[in-house]
Amino acid sequence: MVYATMKPRVAALVLLFGVALDVASFGDLRAQPTGTQVVTRGPARAVWTRERAHAWADSTGWLVGSNFIPSTAINQLEMWQATTFDPRTIDRELGWAESLGFNTMRVFLHNLLWQQDSIGFLSRMDQFLTIADRHHIRPMFVLFDAVWDPMPHLGPQRAPIPHVHNSGWVQSPGAAILADTASFEQLRGYVQGVVGRFGKDRRIVAWDVFNEPDNTNRPVYLAYEPIDKEAHSFILIRKAFVWAREMNPSQPLTAAPWRGDWIDPTRVKPFTAYMLDSSDVITFHSYDDSANVERLVTALERYGRPIICSEYMARPRGSTFQKIVPIFARRHVGAFNWGFSAGKTQTIYPWDSWDREYTAEPAVWFHDIFRSDGAPYDAAEVAFIRGITATAGRR
């Protein structure tokens, strides 16, 4: 991600709505829900062999979809909490995804949902999977996320800051836990409860262990981040991979590099190297143009594993469906663009909306494909997506 300097009006709103923190929200997560475990904990399994990874890829076919949150939710908590869970909108919008030929979606979870109501949370996940399966969509679930607001809280979520990109998205875990490495063990129950419940479920295609774990969100939320965030995230991601592997899921585990140089093997940072070496299948993020995407894919091919781009598509940066998706289709790289239906996340606005004031919809949307009523932002773009997914085929 690229962030610009936060303007005073936004800083004030973040302070007002984001810093008020209910410490009770970070209680003990170790309790397991009764009667929901379908996978038992054992020794952590090894990283898949390349042969097993490619057998999995052969069974899934070319994966293509979006990062998904319903238009009625501002963040992961509003999507999944019982009072705001919206299966009707989810069903409608996943129907639009099916109409594009999408067969997967990347969907974010949150540790606080487990703490709040583990059994109810698992039930809503199961309901989501039932809806997705009806539309022939197998999601990739994201367990942790280090991007945007580091002060999540349960209950009602704040309203969007007008015209500001992702103004209410929250990190998982928040800064209160991430700052204290001694507290990490309380997250084990969440990881193993979720992966244990769904680790053999054919409706799930993969698990993304930690989204952009070394993202310091500078300068938007930098002042509210743990001082040693990157080091602490490195500790947590290593634990999280072990916790997930102890449940022996049948789906692959992965975590995506998103910054730095991984084209030159001698310049790969230890954090990035760990994510790549620990992933059953390789994922990465790129909002760059087609030339750089080609270089990144070529570099990642040295790992000899299936490759998925789990974030791309920022139209003003040259990362468009028409320019990027043909590369992925030709090279059999899975593809998840950022943004699906325009709504409370407001990701039609660019990253610089944290600094530059917008008062109306931008002429060129940054992310997203559909308006909240199902009308496409760009009919020609939607026709292109349908054409290439039909040509590439869905297995």
Predicted feature residues:
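N-terminal secretory signal peptides that target proteins for export/translocation
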Residues: M1-K7
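Bacterial N-terminal signal peptides
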Residues: A11-D28
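Catalytic domains of carbohydrate-active enzymes that cleave complex glycans
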Residues: A383, G387-R395
